[in-house]
């Protein structure tokens, strides 16, 4: 009886350690810096309301031209500067981050790469600077996450 209890206790401790390390690894993953977003990836804004995440595409990124093209609805809230290279996009308080997302489909696996861009801004104003400079509101952070892999048949839906 004592051996079984001891084994269960050790198993629980190991599970807690693994979960803790996994969570910490996920947080630290946000410090990785890939070269740049993928060609034609969609720039997304993230809005969290009542604990549910909602996304809205605000534009696309062209890796060859190193430019971010914003769609019409996003441009309603964005104003180009005199140089034409910078945009100022005022964010609602509920949209703290921008997302660059790109998905690829293999033979049997579906892989989605999420590039998280967090800007350091004053107030709720985010400056989208020409991406040749690699800066966004002073700093740019890209994180890669691998979405859940599913079978090719489910990915074709």
Where are these regions (language model features)?
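Sequence/structural signature of beta-propeller modules
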Residues: 3-4, 12-42, 57-58
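Structural signature of eukaryotic scaffold interfaces centered on beta-propeller domains
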Residues: 32-39, 49, 100-110, 152-157
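Structural motif
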Residues: 43-46, 52-59, 64-76, 122-129
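Residue-level signal for glycine
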Residues: 53-55, 83, 89, 133-136
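Short hydrophobic alpha-helix segments
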Residues: 59-61, 89, 95, 139-140
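Flexible internal linker/loop segments at domain or repeat junctions
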Residues: 70-102
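Loop/turn-rich, solvent-exposed surfaces of beta-rich toroidal or solenoidal domains
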Residues: 92-133
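Conserved blade-ending motifs and adjacent loop-strand segments that build the rim/top face
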Residues: 97-100, 135-157
């Amino acid at each position: 009886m004592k051996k079984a209890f001891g084994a269960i206790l050790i198993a629980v401790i190991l599970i807690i350690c693994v979960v803790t390390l996994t969570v910490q690894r996920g947080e630290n993953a946000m410090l990785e810096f890939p070269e740049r977003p993928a060609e034609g990836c969609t720039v997304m804004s993230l809005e969290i309301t009542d604990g549910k995440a909602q996304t809205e595409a605000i534009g696309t990124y062209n890796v060859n031209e190193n430019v971010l093209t914003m769609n019409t609805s996003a441009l309603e809230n964005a104003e180009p500067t005199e140089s034409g290279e910078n945009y100022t996009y005022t964010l609602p308080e509920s949209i703290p981050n921008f997302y660059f997302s790109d998905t690829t489909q293999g033979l049997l696996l579906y892989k989605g790469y999420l590039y998280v861009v967090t800007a350091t801004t004053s107030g709720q104003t985010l400056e989208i600077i020409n991406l040749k400079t690699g800066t966004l509101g002073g700093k740019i952070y890209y994180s890669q996450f691998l979405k859940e892999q599913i079978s090719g048949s489910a990915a074709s839906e």
